[in-house]
């Protein structure tokens, strides 16, 4: 495992992967406020991708490249109202884009092992309640 290496992933802008239908999103002092009381549960609020086509997304990838077989500790720094209304999904893909495995994270941190067969991954922030 890599020791003392930290990569901070932040939500800095609205992208194609941000749920915007009826949403109010504001960015201030390094914090994001997302409000959408009518958003259905089970939909992604925002996604972070390791691989992106610049021509499609107009931005660089926001997740670091991970080493196969290595363990990583992920910490999610967020506040949600009501409590438990946000969770995260980590999805691993092989080289042809087929989903290998999925980790559902309902706490603030998790330790994962990057699969040996994985080529890419993404992280989705999901809505579990109607008020954030």
Regions found by a protein language model. Name each.
Residues 1-132:
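Extracellular and organelle-lumenal recognition/adhesion modules and their flexible linkers in secreted
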